[in-house]
Amino acid sequence: MTASHPADSGVCIRPAEPRDIASVVEFRSRMFRELGWTDEARLEEVAPLASAYLREQFASGGCTGFVADTPTADGAETVATVVVVWQSVPPSPRNLAGKQAYILGMYVMPEFRRRGIAKALMEAAVECATEAGVPLITLHASDQGRLLYEQMGFHSAPEMRLFTEHAARSAWRPVDDAD
């Protein structure tokens, strides 16, 4: 994919590079805070782990991504990110290839929202997965992103999950309760 420009947004969408990992990790932490994560120590603990994971995945071809940059006096500032993680799953009647893509780190800085940037990043991610022959793309939708994802054809699935680690369960509470 070559760089593209969402209409009238003043930003450039481009493929992510290893130098963008710090932005992905920072934006992912911001996303967790906005969604109600209240354990700052846990976020500080996960940041270097996420950074190492992404470095390894980018180096091995286990993921790819896209960023949105806006021009600044010094060059450009990254204002949004999305990562596509390639996953191997058991083949099934709907997925004979046993491949899927997982979208993570979809985040747009608040002052750049409602300009088509998230849509442009998601379109790039979906196009990338489609071109790679991946028959299934999954993501976890926030309330803010759900409408966009539904407009793009995503739908809810009957997935269930169980967090077995107490720390992963204990620090999550709705934003409304986070005094």
Mark where each language-model region is.
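Conserved acetyl-CoA binding element of GNAT-fold acetyltransferases
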Residues: 94-110, 161
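A short beta-loop-alpha structural element at the N-terminal edge
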Residues: 12-26
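Conserved acetyl-CoA pyrophosphate-binding loop and the N-cap/start of the following alpha-helix
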Residues: 112, 116-124
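Conserved GNAT-fold acetyl-CoA-binding loop/helix
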Residues: 29-53
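Conserved GNAT acetyl-CoA-binding A-motif
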Residues: 122, 129-142
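Conserved beta-strand in the GNAT
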Residues: 67, 76-86, 102, 107
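A short helix-loop-beta-strand connector motif used in the catalytic cores of GNAT acetyltransferases and
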Residues: 52-67, 102
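Conserved catalytic-core motifs of GNAT/GCN5-like acyltransferases
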Residues: 86-92, 138-144, 150, 155-172
